[in-house]
């Protein structure tokens, strides 16, 4: 247990930050999975909707500081490439 007031505050902040990051990490995985499942089922419309949702959320994670811009772009690009295989 923390002995100083500042250490107690840091511990509280760490807990809040950990919870927030867990939420973002879970959301990121679920969005990615939604696109992959739609592609696996061969449903192009569902895949495009899921990709649009993933793109929007990934870039909002960038603005919140959870992801770096390059990381979000790379993830969206890979998902878009996967969705484009349905068109062929």
From Swiss-Prot:
One of its GO terms (cellular component) is cytosol. Residues 1-20 are annotated as: Disordered. Keywords: Ribonucleoprotein, Ribosomal protein, RNA-binding, rRNA-binding. Binds directly to 16S ribosomal RNA. The lineage of its organism: Bacteria, Pseudomonadati, Campylobacterota, Epsilonproteobacteria, Campylobacterales. It comes from Campylobacter fetus subsp. fetus (strain 82-40). This is Small ribosomal subunit protein bS20. Belongs to the bacterial ribosomal protein bS20 family. The keyword Ribosomal protein applies. The gene is rpsT. GO terms for biological process: translation. It comes from the Bacteria. The keyword Nucleotide-binding does not apply. Transmembrane segments: none annotated. GO terms for molecular function: small ribosomal subunit rRNA binding; structural constituent of ribosome.
